[in-house]
Amino acid sequence: MKQHSGNAISVSVIGGADGPTSIFVAGPGEKRALKAGIRDSIYRYKRKRAEKRIVAAPHSLAETVQYAKDKYGLTEAAATDSDYIEQMRRLKENLVLRQKPELLGSLGELPEPDLTDETAVQAFLDLLEARSRKIAQLPDDVVPMDFHLYKIKMGDGLLQMGIDYIWQDLSLSYSGNRAAMRKFKKTAEDLYRFYGVSAADIQNHSARYTALVSALCS
């Protein structure tokens, strides 16, 4: 790609096996859109490749936890842990929105605001806070949960695995420096692979299937 400074245009050539296949001429205001388009194309390619590699080989949540304990030293967080409390709160919100939105009345489904309107955005954020408060006040048996939080630590890095055994929900998140993030990215991919998917998950493109695909092409 050739680039010129100032207000000059940039010319991008995307090559193919038989020579250039696409040529884009972009001014300064179009460069970001061009880069986003290229990123989207790369992601779609990675996703398609990941989907081809997936086969039905599921394991249970309990088996996945034991695998992570044996291989990575996974430990369970106490119910008083601040991370446990926060993740359980988020899970309750998600479950109420998915399973019992009628309990929230007009707060159940909020239209997205005009992002160019600061007042509308602030009003939307206020509604989100009101919805969170309303969900927090609902009794826990509205959406029964059996939530557990597990952790893998590496220096200052941390990987968290949240599991609800009633809803068969597994989520992974991690943080840390660059080295820890690279390590945990591979760990998360390995855990999602081990948890796996069933033939029905593949056929129906279930949430479990989508999570695995996302992990493999991230």
Regions found by a protein language model. Name each.
Residues 1-2, 138:
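Intrinsically disordered, low-complexity segments enriched in polar/charged residues with Gly/Pro
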Residues 2, 6-36, 40:
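Amphipathic alpha-helical packing elements
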Residues 36-218:
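Conserved mixed alpha/beta catalytic, RNA-binding, or beta-rich assembly cores of soluble enzyme
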